[in-house]
């Protein structure tokens, strides 16, 4: 009883115009190798280039898939933000604790004389 009847040799063109089927024979083992290649136009989302199936001496299929990473990876919107929006600018307690700024001033004797003259006017 054959379980893998769908892997029998196919001759001619496939019903899908974008795929082609070819039958090769492995020289070392003599077992047939079936290769299905797709001719889809390459896009950013399409990663699958080739899909080939070879049969073991017992007649079981071995699936081999080849993948290619996209040429230009899509930038992550989470790791590269364009702008930061502060929703409630009046609530500064959420952003951090504000410290009071200490100011120190020194007055020289000449400044005291100026203040005296100004206060007498």
Curated annotation (Swiss-Prot):
Protein keywords: Host-virus interaction, Inhibition of host innate immune response by virus, Suppressor of RNA silencing, Viral immunoevasion
Keyword Nucleotide-binding appears in the UniProt entry: no
Region listing for Disordered, in residue ranges: 11-30
Chain intervals with Polar residues compositional bias: 12-30
Bridged cysteine pairs (disulfide): none
A single GO BP: symbiont-mediated suppression of host innate immune response
Domain of life of the source: Viruses
Function: Pathogenicity determinant. May act as a suppressor of RNA-mediated gene silencing, also known as post-transcriptional gene silencing (PTGS), a mechanism of plant viral defense that limits the accumulation of viral RNAs.
Protein family membership: Belongs to the geminiviridae protein AC4/C4 family.
Protein name per Swiss-Prot or TrEMBL: Protein AC4
Organism field: Cabbage leaf curl virus (isolate Jamaica) (CaLCuV)
